[in-house]
Amino acid sequence: MPRKGHISKRDVLPDPIYGSKTVTKLINNVMYDGKKGIAQQICYDAFDIIKEKTGRDPLEVFEEAMANIMPVLEVKARRVGGATYQVPMEVRPDRRQALGLRWLVDYSRKRGERTMRERLSGEILDAINNMGGAYKKKEDTHKMAEANRAFAHYRW
């Protein structure tokens, strides 16, 4: 914990094409070694592929996909009298978004398509159809929280 009081969160600027802060956060998650231009190109190309395949606004599709992969519950380890319990907790909205974006990018990188733009668009399209690695990760997280519901009274 910081000694000098609360540290405020740094606000991100909306991206230039879609005007969305969530897209900027996606770009930042895709970015490697500070190469933001390449990350932007990957994301915008992925959005073009989505527009081509669905015929819908890619931002709308992306928001829908994010809603499908953002977790509502997660488990946190809590030590009580020598035993460690997995205690189900609600996820804060900012953490929900961060986890959703992280899972989306991580599982995009693990896919088999040739280029990252194809992998990212594929994972987003899978997420709106309730499929794909990121959606499965959310479901697993929820199952884990449900299985440990008995320890919910250890919440803090």
UniProtKB/Swiss-Prot annotation:
Signal peptide: none annotated. Part of the 30S ribosomal subunit. Contacts proteins S9 and S11. Disulfide bonds: none annotated. HAMAP family: Ribosomal_uS7_B. One of its GO terms (molecular function) is tRNA binding. GO terms for biological process: translation. This is Small ribosomal subunit protein uS7. Gene3D superfamilies: Ribosomal protein S7 domain. NCBIfam families: rpsG_bact. Belongs to the universal ribosomal protein uS7 family. Pfam families: Ribosomal_S7 (PF00177). Keywords: Ribonucleoprotein, Ribosomal protein, RNA-binding, rRNA-binding, tRNA-binding. One of its GO terms (cellular component) is small ribosomal subunit. One of the primary rRNA binding proteins, it binds directly to 16S rRNA where it nucleates assembly of the head domain of the 30S subunit. Is located at the subunit interface close to the decoding center, probably blocks exit of the E-site tRNA.
